[in-house]
């Protein structure tokens, strides 16, 4: 690694991002004894300017370099495959390639078609993000409790939401389906939970910032992600409804809890040309109590909203606990 690479501010190893405590070191040691540390592949960094202001004016999203992310990601994926297989062999059948590919097939059957998203789900060892007593269900397409009245989302819902962020709008004259966009540069996740969705996002985005308001879950996500050595995730403890203005603007925002509306602070932090996906509560009689809403920022004061399918998420709350 060159001296220039060492001096880069991002990406950093997770150890450089979060505080390491003695108890967590012991937990990491116990995890490593059963599952070797796995380095997940990440897309190459794309060029973006430093944000000096804590409340920057919205502008175009970070620049993307076509082709670079795909090429580097393919090499990294090849290198990590051997490490993943070795780690999963030590962990037992529940973490085998067969189990992970069976999950990918279930997610695909549920309607997720983007090859990048399916590959990302297939690389992330979901059993590391659930309690040991639920590990046998980790590769089912099901939401599972993670404590504190929160859940790890269904993989098909995770895939669906990320897929929507990756898709481009079709041109008015286009006859075909939507065309996939270039990999995301900077993503904000509201609601880290156990860290699973952030891990999947890290496979399709250059930088992932994730906020959790529940301190024990924030600590759990740090512990879950540390053995995977994911270099492009930054975890934050705080009020997700306020977003993360110091790191804005984001070319994608994904919200993992349902509010009555999308907080204005999050809309303000979305780059022009960016997309936000969130579950929103509805009051329609006879309809779903929540539905996914896709918001596209088309100008400084111009937003376009599209209501999608019904979903069920935990409620979006303010403050920290």
UniProtKB/Swiss-Prot annotation:
Residues 21-65 are annotated as: Disordered. Catalyzes the methyl esterification of L-isoaspartyl residues in peptides and proteins that result from spontaneous decomposition of normal L-aspartyl and L-asparaginyl residues. It plays a role in the repair and/or degradation of damaged proteins. The gene is pcm. The keyword DNA-binding does not apply. GO terms for molecular function: protein-L-isoaspartate (D-aspartate) O-methyltransferase activity. It catalyses: [protein]-L-isoaspartate + S-adenosyl-L-methionine = [protein]-L-isoaspartate alpha-methyl ester + S-adenosyl-L-homocysteine. Residues 21-31 have a biased composition (Basic and acidic residues). One of its GO terms (cellular component) is cytoplasm. It comes from Ralstonia nicotianae (strain ATCC BAA-1114 / GMI1000). Pfam families: PCMT. InterPro entries: PCMT, SAM-dependent_MTases_sf. This is Protein-L-isoaspartate O-methyltransferase. The keyword Secreted does not apply. Its main location: cytoplasm. The active site is at 153.
